[in-house]
């Protein structure tokens, strides 16, 4: 009986850890699949608002764009108009952000950019140097005049066990990015 009392706290921590980590991995898998589907949609000439509507309609737990998630569509283009300020530069050509969670894209520009409806294209894409990206992941090369379609999804992960009370931290925001 004494041995059981000694081992029980450790056993509880292990069981709660397995349950919580499994739950977080399942949620991350859902976020990753949703992100890939978003990039797949926008790479096939679906408008950004239509793609956002599709992802909103197909999302379920843990993703709820009205309360605890954020979706960011970005289209990267290499400037192809010779003689312009953005010729040969990777620029943020289109962007649509949707959702209630306060999160920002890993793709940042050098300055201010405006992306208005209905197509959410950048204003003055050939001449606005503020659209130039600060850096792309190593190995990502955008051909001249080509585009790369990027989807990012952030969602808040809710714990289902008191696992964090034992000093073990599980991420509270899950994130996925897909480049097509």
Where do the language-model regions lie?
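Soluble periplasmic/extracytoplasmic beta-strand elements of cell-envelope proteins
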Residues: 70-75, 150-152, 177
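Intrinsically disordered, low-complexity regions enriched in Pro/Ser/Thr/Gly and acidic residues
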Residues: 79-172
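Amphipathic, coiled-coil-like alpha-helical scaffolding segments used for oligomerization/assembly
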Residues: 61-63
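Short secondary-structure subsegments characteristic of cysteine-rich extracellular domains
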Residues: 170-180
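Alpha-helical assembly-interface signal, strongest on the long, hydrophobic N-terminal helix that forms
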Residues: 1-59, 69-78
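Short, structured loop/turn "capping" segments at alpha-beta junctions
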Residues: 65-69, 83-85
């Amino acid at each position: 009986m004494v041995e059981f009392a000694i081992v029980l706290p450790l056993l509880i921590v292990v069981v709660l850890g397995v349950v919580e980590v499994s739950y977080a991995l399942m949620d991350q898998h859902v976020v990753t699949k949703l992100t890939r589907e978003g990039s797949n949609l926008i790479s096939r000439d679906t408008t950004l608002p239509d793609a956002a509507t599709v992802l909103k309609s197909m999302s379920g737990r843990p993703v709820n764009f009205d309360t605890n998630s954020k979706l960011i569509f970005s289209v990267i283009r290499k400037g192809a108009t010779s003689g312009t300020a953005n010729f040969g530069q990777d620029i943020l050509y289109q962007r649509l952000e949707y959702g209630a969670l306060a999160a920002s894209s890993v793709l940042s520009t050098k300055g201010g950019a405006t992306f208005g409806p209905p197509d959410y294209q950048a204003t003055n894409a050939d001449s606005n140097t503020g659209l130039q990206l600060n850096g792309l992941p190593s190995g990502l090369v955008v051909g001249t005049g080509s585009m790369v379609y990027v989807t990012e999804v952030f969602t808040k992960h809710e714990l289902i066990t008191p696992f964090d009370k034992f000093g073990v931290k599980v991420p509270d925001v899950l994130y996925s990015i897909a480049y097509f």
